[in-house]
Amino acid sequence: MGQIEWAMWANEQALASGLILITGGIVATAGRFTQWYFGAYSIAAGVLICLLEYPRGKRKKGSTMERCGQKYLTSVVKLFGPLTRNYYVRAALHFLLSVPAGFLLATILGTVCLAIASVIYLLAAIRGEQWTPIEPKPKERPQVGGTIKQPPTNPPPRPPAEVRKKPSEGEEEAASAGGPQVNPMPVTDEVV
């Protein structure tokens, strides 16, 4: 049985919690809650989390499905180097971002989800995982000369290979020289 790659689960959990934080922050800010500034903070924190978590990391084994438009954000995330690559840093960052949003009812669900993502990232870091970007594969163009095969010498319909008889040397020479061929079956022109 294969090892579980915890970072993949943490990435999905953190991205969902960022979206939940944005939604809760919009509700708190638009609804003019008494502590609406926590709602505004949740919107900003949710956007930051979504930008950080949108690019998926490359899996150790198998293939990784790249998100739509991920290559643009991947280059931005790569700029921060070890701050975004190290899962200990991500676990601490997500936990610290989740604390202020916990003081408002509209954002408490996003807070809990982000805290869970932080714990999963911590587990991934303990197991030695780290974020590596998905690099685009160079497209290999087939070489023109390597793909062309010899055309068949026998016109269709062709009998199966085991039924075909091997041409003798004399027939091969006649065929290659372009000379007349002798029909082995007698042909009669009688109409019955």
UniProtKB/Swiss-Prot annotation:
Annotated spans, Disordered: 134-192
Extracellular topology ranges: 31-35, 105
Residue intervals annotated with topology Cytoplasmic: 2-7, 54-69, 81-86, 127-192
UniProt modified residues of type Phosphoserine: 168, 176
One Gene Ontology cellular component annotation held by this UniProt entry: apical plasma membrane
NAD found in the keyword field: no
Protein's cellular compartments: Cell membrane
Tissue distribution of the protein: The strongest level of expression is found in kidney, peritoneal neutrophils and peritoneal macrophages, and a lower level in spleen and small intestine. Very low level of expression can be noted in brain, liver, testis, and heart.
Positions of modified residues (Phosphothreonine): 147
Name of this chain's protein: Cytochrome b-245 light chain
Lineage: Eukaryota, Metazoa, Chordata, Craniata, Vertebrata
Family: Belongs to the p22phox family.
Gene from which this protein is expressed: Cyba
Keyword Protein transport (UniProt): no
